[in-house]
């Protein structure tokens, strides 16, 4: 039997307006090489100037994970050659990172587990190589974008724990509003380090790094494949031959990892302090300001459960993303019932989001859903009719009130109309009326169902209940 040992390195782009060492824009998706300057291009004589907003965001992250934020940290040069790295070195932090010794708690299989975070350090992103048929082009718009590299301890033991850790980390970054953490745009990138060892063995064996992972689904698949590959190599007696320190890429079509290059040790990067940048000394005022944090996911969950009476499982769905929590907060701020807000957001709306549509891109915004819930609460429509309204507004950009009128779904609350149907139902079921009066109370539900059926679902259920009780 084997135990899996996993450590994760996450590169998170910080959402500053300008790059970490110059004033070029960090906007995504613009024409190649339009956000560059002598510093980005590594022209002789161009000197870096540190973006203090990046430092503030790093401090906030450190405080959020209960880490040590070093008042003094140092930038180093990480030396390597690659076409998208104009200086032939990357400015990073090696000897003294800005954040170290943090922690994060995940929940897997109902169990809470602590995952240590070794360090989080600031560095600059590289450019991007675009490979065409017979040539490669380099876009340096991304070069110099501020990154926070977050390195976990090797505390993760399977792919489920790894994904839970990444999702928790992702949500913290979003709730802190220090990164958009968009995996598709590359602002939340993950490298996975995987090794195996016999159960009970404390030794750390050869680790393999996996790159090219841009979704939680593929991260899980890559880990599972790599663990299986290493176990088979061990069992076949080929572990030393087939498992060595290397970087592998994940093929998202074949769902396998493939060798890319041998993995470098830190010594090969020849780190040394960057002579162009002074040590970072964080002033007390900046430390104090950046330590004021917004409400984080776990705090929100606790508040929802305690103050709003929401089930813990529902609260976990709501805090699963910043957009979900913001949507829910909008409903509560609009004075919607927490119970109805949970049902209509987590069950009805989420159940209708398909084909890549997210809560952020949903055709039904929080204002529209709030109006729908209001119409349920004030008795204008039934919950059943509200589902029809939601189906309609998912496909048509119309307001809730006009759709209710158009589809004729307004509830009937007129006593005389309801009483006429009640009289008809009771008359047609006189034998059951006698049984009810002799003590068969459960028949009340039958009468309610018959009245609602005759009213084609347009009657107000509360009104039907009250009038039936008075009649019986």
From Swiss-Prot:
What is the role of the protein in this entry?
A: Allows the formation of correctly charged Asn-tRNA(Asn) or Gln-tRNA(Gln) through the transamidation of misacylated Asp-tRNA(Asn) or Glu-tRNA(Gln) in organisms which lack either or both of asparaginyl-tRNA or glutaminyl-tRNA synthetases. The reaction takes place in the presence of glutamine and ATP through an activated phospho-Asp-tRNA(Asn) or phospho-Glu-tRNA(Gln).
Q: Give GO MF terms, alphabetically.
A: asparaginyl-tRNA synthase (glutamine-hydrolyzing) activity; ATP binding; glutaminyl-tRNA synthase (glutamine-hydrolyzing) activity
What is the enzyme's main class? ligase
The name this protein carries in UniProt is Aspartyl/glutamyl-tRNA(Asn/Gln) amidotransferase subunit B
The UniProt catalytic activity note for this protein reads: L-glutamyl-tRNA(Gln) + L-glutamine + ATP + H2O = L-glutaminyl-tRNA(Gln) + L-glutamate + ADP + phosphate + H(+); L-aspartyl-tRNA(Asn) + L-glutamine + ATP + H2O = L-asparaginyl-tRNA(Asn) + L-glutamate + ADP + phosphate + 2 H(+)
User: Which Pfam families does the UniProt record give?
Assistant: GatB_N, GatB_Yqey
Question: Which taxonomic lineage is given here?
Answer: Bacteria, Pseudomonadati, Campylobacterota, Epsilonproteobacteria, Campylobacterales
Superkingdom of source = Bacteria
């Amino acid at each position: 039997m084997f135990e899996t040992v996993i450590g994760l390195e996450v590169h998170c782009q910080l959402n500053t307006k300008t790059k970490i060492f110059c004033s070029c824009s960090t906007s995504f998706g613009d024409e190649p090489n339009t956000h560059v300057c002598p510093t980005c291009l590594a022209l002789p004589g161009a000197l870096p100037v540190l973006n203090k907003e990046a430092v503030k965001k790093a401090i906030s992250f450190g405080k959020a994970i209960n880490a040590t934020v070093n008042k003094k940290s140092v930038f180093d040069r990480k030396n390597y050659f690659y076409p998208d790295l104009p200086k032939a070195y990357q400015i990073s932090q090696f000897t003294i990172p800005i954040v170290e010794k943090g922690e994060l708690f995940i929940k897997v299989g109902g169990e809470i587990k602590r995952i240590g975070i070794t360090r989080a350090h600031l560095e600059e992103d590289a450019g991007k190589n675009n490979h065409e048929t017979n040539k490669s082009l380099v876009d340096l718009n991304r070069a110099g974008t501020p990154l926070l590299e977050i390195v976990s301890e090797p505390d993760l033991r399977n792919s489920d724990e790894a994904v839970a850790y990444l999702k928790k980390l992702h949500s913290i970054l979003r709730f802190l509003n220090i990164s958009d953490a968009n995996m598709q745009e590359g602002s939340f990138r993950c490298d996975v380090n995987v090794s195996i060892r016999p159960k009970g063995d404390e030794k750390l064996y050869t680790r393999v790094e996996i790159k090219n992972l841009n979704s939680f689904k593929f991260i899980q698949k890559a880990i599972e494949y790599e663990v299986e590959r290493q176990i088979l190599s061990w069992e076949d007696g080929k572990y030393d031959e087939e498992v060595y320190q290397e970087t592998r890429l994940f093929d998202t079509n074949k769902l396998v990892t493939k060798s890319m290059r041998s993995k470098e040790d830190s010594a090969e990067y020849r780190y040394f302090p960057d002579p162009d940048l002074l040590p970072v000394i964080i002033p007390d005022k900046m430390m104090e300001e950046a330590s004021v944090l917004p409400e984080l996911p776990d705090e929100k969950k606790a508040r929802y459960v305690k103050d709003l009476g929401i089930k813990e499982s529902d609260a976990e769905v709501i805090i699963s993303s910043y957009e979900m929590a913001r949507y829910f907060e909008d409903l509560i701020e609009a004075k919607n019932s927490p119970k109805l807000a949970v049902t209509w957001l987590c069950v009805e709306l989420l159940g209708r989001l398909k084909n890549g549509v997210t809560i952020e891109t949903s055709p039904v915004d929080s204002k529209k859903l709030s109006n729908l819930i209001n119409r349920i609460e004030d008795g204008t429509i039934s919950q059943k009719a509200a589902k029809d309204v939601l189906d309609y507004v998912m496909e048509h950009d119309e307001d809730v009130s006009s759709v209710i009128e158009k589809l004729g779904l307004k509830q009937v609350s007129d006593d005389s109309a309801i009483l006429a149907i009640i009289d008809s139902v009771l008359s047609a079921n006189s034998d059951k009326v006698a049984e009810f009066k002799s003590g068969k109370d459960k028949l009340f539900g039958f009468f309610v169902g018959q009245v609602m059926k005759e009213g084609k679902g347009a009657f107000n259920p509360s009104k039907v209940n009250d009038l039936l009780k008075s009649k019986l």
